């Protein structure tokens, strides 16, 4: 199957005449199709939830589209946590995966109901102290 761009050269030239560059142009239909495909692929696993890495594309409009398909937000900074909360993520919708993280970021992630994902066993004792 031959892949074709979601926008023609003529349409792209029309867009660039109207909007200054640089800008990002997203394929909403393609994003929705892929999010739906992931959701359907794992539908057999009732506990499965996909978490989108916010740092990959910190665009609240795209993240809201992904939320429509059951995706949560994988955050790695205070800014990403705050954005995810601001766009309506609820408890359990946020995964916080962060390295070399200030105490206040762990506290905030916990406060908003984030799932704290650790990659270092020594953080367990640290979190136990600060999240009491």
Model-based region annotation:
Residues 1-116, 122-131:
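A charged N-terminal "starter" segment
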């Amino acid at each position: 199957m031959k892949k074709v761009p979601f926008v023609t050269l003529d349409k792209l030239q029309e867009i660039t005449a109207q909007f200054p560059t640089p800008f990002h142009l997203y394929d909403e239909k393609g994003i929705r199709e892929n999010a739906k495909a992931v959701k359907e692929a794992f539908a057999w696993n009732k506990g499965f939830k996909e978490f989108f890495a916010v740092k990959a594309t910190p665009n609240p409009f795209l993240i809201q589209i992904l939320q429509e398909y059951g995706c949560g937000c994988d955050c790695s900074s205070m800014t990403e946590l705050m954005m995810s909360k601001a766009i309506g993520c609820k408890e359990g919708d946020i995964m916080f995966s962060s390295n070399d993280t200030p105490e206040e970021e762990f506290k905030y992630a916990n406060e908003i109901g984030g799932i704290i994902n650790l990659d270092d066993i020594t953080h367990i004792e640290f979190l136990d102290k600060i999240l009491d």
